[in-house]
Design a protein with these regions (language model features):
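Low-complexity, glycine- and small/polar-enriched segments
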Residues: 1-253
Length: 253
């Protein structure tokens, strides 16, 4: 189980007033890159999520067996910039870039004809990989001046996840006297809010406001049973699901 909680707030401002006031420029950039790997492994070395058994692993239990990997990520980012002057041009700009790269894998290792993983669990085997993301990004830029003014805000969110529940090749689960349920589940649930706003104010000149909010959500969510596996079970369930709720808004004026 891995929990990531991130709060990042950056605000900049520049103000010039008086008869000799000149131009003001305020810029507020934020860049955040999060990478995480959460593995639950049976039959392979730690951190070798793609590994093949180097020896036969036998698990013999009286009740149930579970291989579970969970990664929960909560991110809030806010960037704001304000440039105000009474005698010249005001410029305010904000840029927020957030990149989230995750691997969440629950794996019963890949086997061969010689080496494999054997699990005896009368009450069943579950292999579960679960990833959740709750991301909120807010970006705002304000430029105000007696003459021309300009403002801009850009928010870019990139989420790329690899979520895998895997019962490897040549795995052996149960026997004629032990038939529990076998459940493989992979899920990725994301809630994302991405808002960018920009405003340009001018008394006697031109003003420009530009905002942009981009979201790139990619990756794979997969549950699989490998080739040449032998399973004795009452029921076998293999499920994968990606559930994404997004709100992306860009406003400028």
């Amino acid at each position: 189980l891995q929990d990531n909680d991130i709060l990042d707030i950056v605000v900049n401002g520049a103000v010039a007033a008086g008869k000799d006031a000149g131009a003001t420029i305020s810029v507020s950039p934020t860049v955040y890159v999060v990478t995480s790997k959460t593995y639950a492994l049976l039959g392979t070395k730690p951190n070798e999520a793609e590994g093949i058994c180097e020896k036969t692993t036998k698990v013999n239990l009286k009740k149930s067996a579970s291989v579970n990997a969970t990664d929960n990520t909560n991110i809030i980012t806010a960037a704001g910039a304000v440039g105000i002057t009474t005698g010249g041009s005001g410029v305010g700009g904000s840029v927020d870039v957030t990149v989230l790269l995750k691997e969440v894998k629950a794996i019963v290792a890949e086997g061969t004809e010689v080496y494999y993983v054997s699990v005896i669990a009368p009450e069943g085997l579950s292999v579960t990989a679960k990833s959740t993301e709750d991301i909120e990004a807010f970006v705002f830029g304000l430029g105000a001046g007696d003459n021309s003014s300009a403002s801009g805000s850009i928010s870019v969110l990139v989420v790329e996840n690899d979520v895998l529940s895997n019962l490897g090749n040549y795995a052996k689960v149960g026997n004629e006297n032990s038939r529990g349920n076998v459940n493989l589940s992979a899920s990725d649930q994301a809630k994302i809010i991405n808002i960018a706003g920009a405003a340009g104010l001018s008394i006697s000149g031109n003003c420009v406001g530009i905002s942009n909010a981009d979201l790139i959500f990619d990756g794979t969510t997969k549950a699989r049973i490998g080739n040449n596996s032998i399973i004795f079970a009452k029921n076998v369930n293999v499920n994968s699901k990606t559930d994404t709720n997004t709100v992306s808004v860009a406003v400028s004026g």
